[in-house]
């Protein structure tokens, strides 16, 4: 397990680059973390990300964004959990897990979980598993871009995570 600790008034950007278990603890007031992971799985590759974010102090902030693209017979599993402990009000935490499937044999699973043990917090999650929308491909192809180039552009844009 890889563990990250964010202390009082500290700001961290944490990049998740490989399968594994991750723990992020916000241990002091004003601690902030931006957690980003973007993955391309091909052939029979399996990507498994288990991440737990624990708010252990008041007035903390996290934004966790995981994105994946699964091709061929690959699989992607995102398990994200946010815990806001007792007496940790005024904390904000957001978890997003999104996967694009590029093959009928590719697989994905997203499991966001929230455990809120106090009041006066903002906490939310979003999860989606989808294929590339035909309307996006059609739009790019109507501008003279080949289907393969259009798919590549959409995938590149999907995996390119902005830092907030």
Where are these regions (language model features)?
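Short arginine-rich
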Residues: 155-164
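Conserved beta-strand/loop scaffold segments within soluble protein domains that form the structured core
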Residues: 1-138, 142-145, 159-160
């Amino acid at each position: 397990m890889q563990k990250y600790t964010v202390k009082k008034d500290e700001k961290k950007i944490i990049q998740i680059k490989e399968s594994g278990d991750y723990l992020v603890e916000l241990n002091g007031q004003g601690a902030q973390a931006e957690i980003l992971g973007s993955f391309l799985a091909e052939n029979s590759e399996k990507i498994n990300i288990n991440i737990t974010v624990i708010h252990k102090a008041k007035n903390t902030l996290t934004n966790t964004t995981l994105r994946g693209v699964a091709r061929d017979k690959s699989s992607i599993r995102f398990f994200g959990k946010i815990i806001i402990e007792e007496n940790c009000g005024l904390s904000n935490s957001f978890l997003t897990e999104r996967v694009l499937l590029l093959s009928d044999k590719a697989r994905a699973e997203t499991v966001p979980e929230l455990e809120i043990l106090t009041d006066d917090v903002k906490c939310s999650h979003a999860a989606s598993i989808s294929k590339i929308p035909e309307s996006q491909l059609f739009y790019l192809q109507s501008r003279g871009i080949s289907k393969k180039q259009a798919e590549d552009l959409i995938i590149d844009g999907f995996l390119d995570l902005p830092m907030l």
